[in-house]
Amino acid sequence: MASTLIVDQLQKTGGSTTALPLPTSNASADEFLKNDGAGALSWASAGGGLLGLVVYTSSGTYTVGATTNGTAGNQGSADVSKVIIECQAAGGAGASRGGTGSAYQGGSGGGGAYSKTFRDLTDITSITIVVPTGPAGGSPGAAGGAASLTKASGSGTFATITCDGGSAGGSPSGTTQGASGAGAAVPTTGDINIGGGIGPAGGEGQGARSGFSFMGVGQAFPNGVTTGPAPVGYGSGGICGPTSAPGTGGAGGAGIILIWEYK
């Protein structure tokens, strides 16, 4: 036969006695009984931990506590209170060669900047996410766009996070090779900040690679190709156009933002 134990206090045995009054209300899901050190008991939430990852490969809005976040629209946890943010900007595109029959190459694009940052989301409601696409190669190529996170709503403090994109490779003239694309400057808004790698100037041969980024690898082109290969990873620069026609410069790597959620 089942029995029921009904108490309003717990008292330890042996030595002096300390009353441990139980809370009058029931616990919520996942709560535990906590002692404040003076004998008072209360229900408390379990300790923190990693809840999951929210991925943005395009611009959008991150709503704190929503489960419809991310580019996929199905990511996020209702229990989030803190985040670690990885922000990668786009790389600059490579420039095309100098025209039909030209032996002059464009420069390769520079890599985009990266940062990693811890943030508390207390009283933050939503954050505007900007993720740049990969710029196309051409004459000249286009510069890589910046990636950023800015508070959209809420009374809490959230300083803007910004990483700049890499510069495009320069176009060749009729007598000179294209200039190298500068890597993005080291950011100043993250806890860990890494700038982009420089892209080589035109004419540095098949061993030349476009500018590296923290999340992307610099690209090269094999013998016989006519267009700069696609970027590898995120934020790397585009490779210069090969000397074989049409000699189009490679695209820069797109940006990405990762939000690691914690309780």
Please report, for each region that a protein language model flagged, where it lies by residue.
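Disulfide-bonded cysteine-rich modules in secreted/extracellular proteins
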Residues: 10, 50-58
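Acidic glycine-/aspartate-rich tracts in secreted/extracellular proteins
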Residues: 12, 26-28, 36-40, 89-94, ...
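Extracellular repetitive beta-rich solenoid segments
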Residues: 1-48
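Glycine-rich, flexible loop motifs
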Residues: 129, 215, 219-221
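Acidic, low-complexity glycine/serine/threonine-rich segments
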Residues: 134-190
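Glycine-rich strand-loop-strand elements at beta-sheet edges
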Residues: 55-77, 84-152, 238-259
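Collagen triple-helix signature
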Residues: 109, 137, 144, 165, ...
